A protein has these predicted regions:
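STAS-like cytosolic regulatory interaction modules
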Residues: 1-44, 51-88
Length: 88
């Protein structure tokens, strides 16, 4: 099994998602994504996390999200995504 570790920093927002998606291609194979450096996220940021999770699942692997701040976790709960995304 291939696992990867990655870290995202700054804001996960609409303006940055295309750039971040390109930078996170390797994370689509499963592993741990560290969000401890993320200051803020919007719904586009959550969509990025969902896409990375989807890519992992498509390969039969798992993506675990570590270090997410409370704002990100609450936003995921609000949209019911805490049942899909795996927060450590």
């Amino acid at each position: 099994m291939t696992t990867a570790q990655g870290m995202l920093q700054g804001e996960l927002n609409f303006a940055r998602v295309p750039q971040l998606l390109a930078q996170t291609q390797a994370l689509g194979v499963g592993g741990v994504l560290d969000l401890s450096g993320v200051s803020n996220a919007d719904s586009a940021g959550l969509a990025l996390l969902l896409e990375l999770s989807r890519r992992s699942k498509a390969k039969g692997l798992h993506l675990s999200i570590r270090g997410a701040n409370e704002q990100i976790v609450q936003l995921a709960r609000f949209f019911g995504l805490d049942q899909i995304l795996h927060f450590e």
